[in-house]
């Protein structure tokens, strides 16, 4: 049995807290990513991993030592690192004659590989080569995907989902306008994926809404899709399954229209409208003569009944 697969009993309170953090939760922690370079990674691949790590901070772990592994042939080492560092996302960089400047991006489910997609780097401009101001660490990016392939082709559709998982950052309930600081733009065109990073500049516009300008921040990559190893539809659905406790409870007799208006249905007993007290107006009051005639009529009806 593997050392990491054993049931570990904590001996101290600190170890107990550490293991409790890794236990399954209804609302999971922010997904961390590990960035690993292969045994033959060159300077380009190493710099790409460093730049992606700079964008992912503090939700990333950069492995500085080279690791000889092949993600498509054997995933045991990746699963070992995933369990050891509690990371559900990974990026692996390598370089060889057959596949130069190679990036493998993937994600885990229950510490087992779910999806792996291989990308080739054709052009790269580093974060440090673009001499502009950068965003502070931990800034949540805006993600933009352009191109029909992201919605049509299954490989590109799964790649889009994987990139959203990789760069989305923490889930927040509210966002202030000044917190929108940079954009990650992915374009799928003619079999290539163009990855660009821009800083958002809010300029004065003379009204309440500011004028927006984009300034390239880096890194910039031209990628091409190579190999893929995708999870089956059943396993993918299982990984997306939401716990029952988080599912919103259905409310009976409530419906919504296209404009978001809420309609409710109330069940009541039949009301006797003859006893309903209505508002009396002076103009509708009966005159004494009319009242006297009505009383006499009622009296005659009672006598006839008797």
UniProtKB/Swiss-Prot annotation:
* Main localisation: nucleus
GO CC, one annotated term? nucleolus
Q: Where is this region: Disordered?
A: 268-306
Q: Which GO terms describe its biological process?
A: maturation of LSU-rRNA from tricistronic rRNA transcript (SSU-rRNA, 5.8S rRNA, LSU-rRNA); protein localization to nucleolus; regulation of signal transduction by p53 class mediator; ribosomal large subunit assembly; ribosomal large subunit biogenesis
Q: Where is the composition biased (Basic residues)?
A: 277-289
Return the Basic and acidic residues bias intervals.
290-300
Asked if the record carries the keyword Cell wall biogenesis/degradation, the reply is: no
* InterPro entries linked: Brix (IPR007109), Rpf2 (IPR039770)
Subunit details: Component of a hexameric 5S RNP precursor complex, composed of 5S RNA, RRS1, RPF2/BXDC1, RPL5, RPL11 and HEATR3; this complex acts as a precursor for ribosome assembly.
| Role, per record | Involved in ribosomal large subunit assembly. May regulate the localization of the 5S RNP/5S ribonucleoprotein particle to the nucleolus.
Q: What is this protein called?
A: Ribosome production factor 2 homolog
